[in-house]
Every structure is written in structure tokens, then in C-alpha cells.
């Protein structure tokens, strides 16, 4: 039975991976998993212990890949197949517990910078792409040969973008090819200008050009599941792409295309709704998601400062993977904010849903920072690192005397007038002394006390002075599942 506070330990062992036996033919292992490149990575580092991280859908090949690498490199391989939170993030903690000197991540990845300096390489996979069908679909959707278009893809199809561009370049002059933002080798030459990095991808823009000028042609997904809600990577692109610019998705197997403009509008509309919910909230639960991504401590401190500045109370909850059963134990929270990688924060919610909405840090920033967005720029960000100092999108909080804090606002959900937030120091107790009448009567206003008084059950009744005083006696011994006086029956 699932615990309401933590996932059972047996869940990882009893979960069906869905891929029995060998998934890839032995003769294709070298090509699919890029074993030659992985071998060079291990040999160049001289590692003796290497961790291999596989998602559930690739566990059928994990044993064969590990054996092949051990034979070629002579190093000891450890398979990490029980990632507790999200397989798209690098499991640095698991690799360190195994004593690994390097880590190889297989499968889809968010490509977020890890929190550790452990050497890491990524194998995104190589999904087959029908280049001729995709090229014809591109020409049908882009009749203007001078229109600026950027080629995007899911990580497993990135290997085919250059070949697709070769088929299109004789006709289209303004093509931009994106590539996964993989970690660059140490000491690699940097003679060319550094490309723009966004959405886990690199965009080699020409001088004077910006990404907002381009439309998008995305190769990925499938005909059966074209809903971007089911694909966090596509949702990230749709949220962040410039509104009004075309965004076309293409199935790599059939070449069937779909205009994602309507889906992008739905995602942005939901984000605006969540921002309104955050503005109405008084108590915020900060969910500490994956701890293997860089700057998660700085982001957590930033979110706490943000909620304090907006006059809201925040509580940090470390619950692992969020589930409706876990979060239902905290009815005091008005909203939850998930601090995770972009793919983890935009992952689809389980069936049944949560009783309180789960937001991303970017939505909380838009709700609590009155200076957001910066003038002339309204990006739909998806990664919390873009909110921190050093990012081009960082917007500092206005000073306490700024008029931005005194601007009245009306809730678009309830229709009530929201009072202007007040800047509260960390030493504030959360209660305000009010003197509404000259009788000098003292009244305390506390959000926590107001919520407690509205609950149907407020805890055990103290009954002070109503029960006799007794000497303390020994109570029951054992644990809740089996006390000593209950026997084994």
C-alpha cells in the first residue's frame, strides 16, 4: 500500500519496466548507444568505475551495453536503473554512492547542468527519421523560401537534422539548425562565437539576428500522441516560443504535420490562470524536487525571498516525487511550487489530479515580482535558473519604497480586490496589532490562526483544569504496525 508521505521501497522493485529481454538487436547496439563515443569518453578519463544510467524503457539493453563496455574498456560498469525522481535528470547522488568516477546518461535528458562536477556524457539515442517525407512536409508548410525557420527535434531525432537541412538548403536560404546543448569537452577550441543556449538546445545565430524572428519546424512525437501535454519537451518549446510565430510539428515516421499554435495558446492560457492562483494564495508550499540540478539551493532561497516580499508564507517540503496522496496531507497550502528541471516541472500530472495547483518557479516569479516582466520583453520561461542573478532574464525585486508594491489589483478568479503586498522582514512574527477603536483593544490577525479556526477538526481538546492529575505510567511499546500487547494475530 502506498504511503501518504513517501513512496514504498518495494515500488522500484515491483514496477514493470515494460521492456522484457533484449530490446535492441546485438548488431545494432554500437550504433544505437554510440558505444564507440562512450568508449573514448571512458578511456580518455581513465576511469575504473563508471555509472550507466538507463530509463525504464531502455533497461532491457542495460546488461548487454554494460558487458560490451566492460570488455572494451576494462572498467567496472554500474547500472543505475532505479532513479527515484525523474530519469531525464542526471542521478549524480546514485553515481556517487556507487563510487563512480564518471557517468553515462542514456535516453531522453533535460540537459540541465548537474550540481556535481562529475564527468558526464549523454547518449540521446538515434530514432529513425523518414527524411524524404519530412522534407516534403516542410515544403508544404513553408511555401515562402525566404521565411526564417529553425529546425527543432526531440533529442532522439537530433542526429537527422543536418541531413534534413541538406535536402532543404537548395530552396530555403534562411534555415537555422538547432542542436542539443550537450556538455562541451574540456579544452575544446572556441574560435566561433558562442551560440545561444535556450530550451536545452544551441542555436548558432548570425550576428544581428535573434531567435524571436524565426518560425519553428519540430521533428518528433508520433501520429498517435500529438498532444504536447504528454510531451514535456514539446511543452517547454511551445511555452517559450515567440507568440505569433508559426510552430509546426512533424512525425518522423509518417511526415504528418500539425500546427501547434492552438496548443501553445492553451498552455499560455493555463500559465496565466496559474499566475492568478499564485497571486490569490496566502500560503505557498515549495516542493524540493530533484536535488541533482545545479543552483537548486540558490533557487530555493530566491523563492523564499520572493514569497516573503509578496506578503505570503512559504514552507519547504521534501517529499520526493509529488503525488496527490502526499500533497493532500497539507491542506493549509493554497498552491504548490515544484522546484525541478523544466521537463520535471512540466511533466503530466497523474490521473485524479491534485487538490491544489502545482506551479513552476517562473509562474511564481510572475505573480510575486511586480517588476516582472522587464520592459519590452515578456518571455515564457521554463527553467528556474533563468530567474537567478546572472541570467539575462533576471529582474531584481523593487525596493520597499517603490510604488510598484502599492499598486492595487483585482483578482480575475474571485473578483475581490487584492490589497497591495507589504515588505516584511524575516523577524516579523506574521501577526499585526490593530487598534480599530479608541478603546485601545488589541486584536491580532494571523493567517495561520484564521485557517485553524476554519477547520472542522482542530486537534486534541486540551481541557485545561477539567481532568484529574495522574502519575505518568509506562505506555505501549513497539511500532504502529505491531505493538507488543497486540500479539502476532
Swiss-Prot record:
Q: Which cofactor does it need?
A: [4Fe-4S] cluster
Which Pfam family, an example, fits this chain? Answer: Diphthamide_syn
Residues reported to bind [4Fe-4S] cluster: 89, 110, 341
Q: Which UniProt keywords apply?
A: Acetylation, Iron, Iron-sulfur, Metal-binding, Phosphoprotein
Question: Where is region (Required for function) located?
Answer: 398-489
Under the cellular component aspect of Gene Ontology, which terms does the record hold?
2-(3-amino-3-carboxypropyl)histidine synthase complex
One example GO MF annotation: 2-(3-amino-3-carboxypropyl)histidine synthase activity
Signal peptide (from-to)? none
Entry annotated with the keyword Acetylation: yes
UniProt-listed InterPro entries = DHP2, DPH1/DPH2, DPH1/DPH2_1, DPH1/DPH2_3
Q: How is the cofactor bound?
A: Binds 1 [4Fe-4S] cluster per subunit. The cluster facilitates the reduction of the catalytic iron-sulfur cluster in the DPH1 subunit.
Residues recorded as bearing N-acetylmethionine in the entry? 1
Q: Which domain of life is it from?
A: Eukaryota
Asked whether the UniProt record includes tRNA processing among its keywords, one would answer: no
List of residues that carry Phosphoserine: 7, 446, 456, 488
Q: In which pathway does it act?
A: Protein modification; peptidyl-diphthamide biosynthesis
Q: Which GO terms describe its biological process?
A: protein histidyl modification to diphthamide
The record's subunit annotation is:
Component of the 2-(3-amino-3-carboxypropyl)histidine synthase complex composed of DPH1, DPH2, DPH3 and a NADH-dependent reductase. Interacts with DPH1.
Q: So what does this one do?
A: Required for the first step of diphthamide biosynthesis, a post-translational modification of histidine which occurs in elongation factor 2. DPH1 and DPH2 transfer a 3-amino-3-carboxypropyl (ACP) group from S-adenosyl-L-methionine (SAM) to a histidine residue, the reaction is assisted by a reduction system comprising DPH3 and a NADH-dependent reductase. Facilitates the reduction of the catalytic iron-sulfur cluster found in the DPH1 subunit.
Task: Give the protein family.
Answer: Belongs to the DPH1/DPH2 family. DPH2 subfamily.
Give the protein name, as stated in the record. Answer: 2-(3-amino-3-carboxypropyl)histidine synthase subunit 2
Origin organism of this chain? Cricetulus griseus
- Origin organism lineage: Eukaryota, Metazoa, Chordata, Craniata, Vertebrata
Gene name, Swiss-Prot/TrEMBL? DPH2
Amino acid at each position: 500500500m502506498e504511503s501518504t508521505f513517501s513512496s514504498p521501497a518495494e515500488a522500484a522493485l515491483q514496477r514493470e519496466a515494460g521492456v522484457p529481454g533484449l530490446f535492441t538487436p546485438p548488431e545494432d547496439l554500437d550504433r544505437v548507444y554510440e558505444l564507440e563515443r562512450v568508449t573514448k569518453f571512458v578511456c580518455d578519463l581513465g576511469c575504473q568505475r563508471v555509472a550507466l544510467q538507463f530509463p525504464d524503457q531502455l533497461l532491457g539493453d542495460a546488461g548487454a551495453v554494460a558487458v560490451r563496455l566492460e570488455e572494451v574498456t576494462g572498467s567496472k560498469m554500474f547500472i543505475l536503473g532505479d532513479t527515484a525522481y525523474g530519469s531525464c535528470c542526471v542521478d549524480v547522488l546514485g553515481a556517487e554512492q556507487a563510487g563512480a568516477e564518471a557517468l553515462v546518461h542514456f535516453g531522453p535528458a533535460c540537459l540541465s547542468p548537474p550540481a556535481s562536477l562529475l564527468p558526464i556524457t549523454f547518449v540521446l539515442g538515434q530514432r529513425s527519421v523518414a527524411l524524404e517525407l519530412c522534407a516534403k512536409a516542410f515544403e508544404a508548410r513553408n511555401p515562402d523560401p525566404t521565411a526564417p525557420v529553425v529546425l527543432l527535434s526531440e533529442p532522439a531525432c537530433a542526429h537527422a537534422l543536418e541531413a534534413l537541412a541538406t535536402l532543404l538548403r537548395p530552396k530555403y536560404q534562411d534555415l537555422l539548425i538547432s542542436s542539443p546543448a550537450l556538455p562541451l569537452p574540456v579544452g575544446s577550441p572556441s574560435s566561433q562565437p558562442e551560440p545561444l543556449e535556450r530550451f536545452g538546445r544551441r542555436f548558432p545565430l548570425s550576428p544581428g539576428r535573434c531567435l524571436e524572428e524565426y518560425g519553428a519546424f519540430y521533428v518528433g512525437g508520433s501520429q498517435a500522441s500529438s498532444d504536447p501535454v504528454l510531451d514535456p519537451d514539446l511543452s517547454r518549446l511551445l511555452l517559450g516560443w515567440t507568440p505569433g510565430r508559426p510552430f509546426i510539428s512533424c512525425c518522423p515516421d509518417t511526415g504528418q504535420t500539425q500546427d501547434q499554435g492552438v496548443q501553445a495558446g492553451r498552455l499560455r492560457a493555463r500559465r496565466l490562470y496559474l499566475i492568478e492562483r499564485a497571486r490569490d494564495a496566502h500560503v505557498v508550499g515549495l516542493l524540493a524536487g530533484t536535488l541533482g540540478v545545479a543552483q537548486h539551493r540558490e533557487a530555493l532561497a530566491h523563492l523564499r525571498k520572493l514569497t516573503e516580499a509578496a506578503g505570503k508564507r512559504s514552507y519547504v517540503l521534501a517529499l520526493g516525487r509529488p503525488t496527490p496522496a502526499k500533497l493532500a496531507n497539507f491542506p493549509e497550502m493554497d498552491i504548490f511550487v515544484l522546484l525541478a528541471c523544466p521537463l520535471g516541472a512540466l511533466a503530466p500530472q497523474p490521473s485524479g489530479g491534485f487538490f491544489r495547483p502545482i506551479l513552476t518557479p517562473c509562474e511564481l516569479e510572475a505573480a510575486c515580482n511586480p517588476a516582472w516582466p522587464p520592459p519590452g520583453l515578456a518571455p515564457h520561461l521554463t527553467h528556474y535558473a533563468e530567474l537567478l542573478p546572472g541570467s539575462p532574464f533576471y529582474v531584481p525585486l523593487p525596493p520597499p519604497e517603490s510604488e510598484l508594491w502599492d499598486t492595487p489589483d483585482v483578482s480575475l478568479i474571485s473578483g475581490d480586490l487584492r490589497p497591495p503586498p507589504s515588505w516584511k522582514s524575516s523577524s516579523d512574527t506574521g501577526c499585526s496589532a490593530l487598534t480599530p477603536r479608541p478603546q485601545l483593544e488589541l486584536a491580532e490577525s494571523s493567517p495561520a490562526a484564521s485557517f485553524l479556526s476554519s477547520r472542522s477538526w482542530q486537534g486534541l481538546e486540551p481541557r485545561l483544569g477539567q481532568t484529574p492529575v495522574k502519575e505518568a505510567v509506562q505506555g505501549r511499546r513497539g511500532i504502529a504496525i505491531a505493538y507488543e500487547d497486540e500479539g502476532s494475530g
